[in-house]
Amino acid sequence: MIISPQSLDTNLSQLLAEVKSGSMQLPEFQRDWTWDDSRLRGIIASLSQGYPMGAIMRLQYGNPDIQFKYRTITGVKGVSVKPEHLILDGQQRLTSIYQATSSKEPVSTKTEKGKAIKRYYYLSMEKCLDDDEDRFDAVLSIPEDRKIKENFDRDVKLDLSTREYEYENKL
């Protein structure tokens, strides 16, 4: 029996819920997640403008004749269920979006030069509403302590360590 591919429009929040629950996972043979800070900011900027994230290819899991080992995407914690689908293409995008928007932990990523960093991502509401601003510049990459410092880390330029500070700074 030949199974033809299907094209489905699935909203992003549903895809992220499937990732979080473990119903959508990766086949073990997939490479690890590798996106750097700049690419993360880029996809957040694109999605915030309503651009599509591109196609996600996935395989329905469960055929007894074809069994792959599987694993959750990077950042998903405490899930040990059998998946309904395996992600064949789109892992980098889904992992990036999941970690930046749905995980409570900072994203473990790297700079463009390869230095390991941990970041939280915010949208500057003021910059998002300004038509003259590049949306990429509206996506802020904040260190794991949620503070931007200057003067050799002596002075705090921006503090987002509490919800109140986030709201106060319109992020």
Feature-to-residue mapping (PLM):
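Basic- and aromatic-enriched surface patches that contact anionic nucleotides/nucleic acids
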Residues: 2-37, 41-171
